[in-house]
Amino acid sequence: MSWLAALLSLLLWAAPAWAIQPLDPSAAVVEVLQMPVSTAQRQCWLEAEASQWEPWLKQQAGYRGRDLLWAPERQQAVVLVGWQSQQQWDAIPASSIGPTEEAFNAQLRDCLGVSDQQPLPLQRAGALKPLQP
C-alpha cells in the first residue's frame, strides 16, 4: 500500500508541470530564457509558469511548446520556448507581454513572500535555431 501513497504523492506534486505543452522538435526557432531559481523557489516558479505564462503562450500564433529545465547544482532555470517562425515570435506586441509578466511576478511575490518587483530576474534571453540534419 505504501507504493500507492508514493505514486499519489508524486502525481500530486508533479501535476502542475503536466499543464505545460512540451517543446515541439520541429520548432524553427527556440527562445532561451535563463534565471536564478533556488531550491526554495522552484515550486513557486513552476506553478507561476504553468498558471501565468502557459495560457498566454497557447494563445500566441506560432507557439510550439516549451521545456522548463532546472540545474540544482547551479540553482538556475532555463526556459526553452519553441516558435514556428521568427516572424511569428517577433509579431507579438510588447504591450501584450507586460500584463502576463506582471501577473507572473505577482504570483511569485505572493508565493515566495517577497516584495521584489521581479523576484526571479532574467539573466539571459536570446534565440537558437535548431541544426538541420
Question: Predicted segment positions?
Answer:
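An amphipathic, aromatic/His-enriched active-site/gating alpha helix that lines ligand/cofactor pockets
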Residues: 51-64, 82-120, 131
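Glycine-rich beta-strand-turn "strand-cap" elements at beta-sheet edges
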Residues: 4, 15-30, 67-75, 101-133
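Hydrophobic alpha-helical segments of integral membrane proteins
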Residues: 9-13
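Short, well-ordered beta-strand segments in beta-rich or mixed alpha/beta enzyme
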Residues: 28-36, 65-96
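Bacterial N-terminal signal peptides that target proteins for export
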Residues: 1-7
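Generic structural motif
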Residues: 38-40, 86, 125
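Short, surface-exposed ligand-recognition loops at beta-strand->loop->(often short) alpha-helix junctions
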Residues: 36-49
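Short, aromatic-enriched amphipathic alpha-helices that serve as compact interaction elements
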Residues: 32, 49-52
